[in-house]
């Protein structure tokens, strides 16, 4: 039996990331939104790579049964982008996190992190990946994911 490939929206922010199909399925075959998402951690990795922790404001509706059982109502993503062609940082990364914008571009990915005093632009000609997804209770604060 052949598995039918699911066609993800080409303009969806996660389209430039490996592992986006799992996110698509988790959200009931709808694109998870980046509106209100916050990047809480950013780490540079050699050679020419970055990892970031992004907390989504959006959540699956309805919540998966396992989430409801455990009281989870939010999702944290660990993103990895390697082979970066540009990593530009300006200002200190704020302790409370910053806004995040991710877009697919020409077979790769573009990520911008920003606040009033911080700006980061990261681009790569190859796809990044969603390295890990973790459900958590928003009231308990963000989970600690190691970069």
Place the predicted regions along the sequence by residue.
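Surface-exposed, interaction-prone regions used to assemble/regulate multi-protein complexes
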Residues: 1-147
């Amino acid at each position: 039996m052949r598995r039918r490939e699911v066609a993800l929206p080409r303009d969806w922010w996660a389209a430039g990331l490996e592992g986006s199909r799992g996110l698509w399925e988790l959200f009931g075959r709808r694109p998870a939104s980046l509106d209100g998402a916050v990047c809480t951690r950013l780490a540079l990795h050699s050679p020419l790579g970055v990892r970031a922790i992004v907390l989504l404001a959006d959540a699956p509706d309805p919540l998966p049964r396992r989430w409801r059982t455990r009281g989870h109502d939010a999702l944290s993503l660990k993103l990895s982008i390697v082979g970066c062609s540009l990593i530009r940082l300006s200002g200190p990364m704020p302790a409370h996190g910053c806004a995040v914008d991710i877009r697919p571009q020409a077979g790769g990915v573009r990520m911008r992190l920003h606040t009033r005093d911080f700006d980061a632009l990261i681009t790569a000609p190859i796809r990044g990946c969603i390295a890990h997804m973790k459900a958590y209770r928003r009231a308990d604060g963000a989970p600690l994911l190691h970069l």
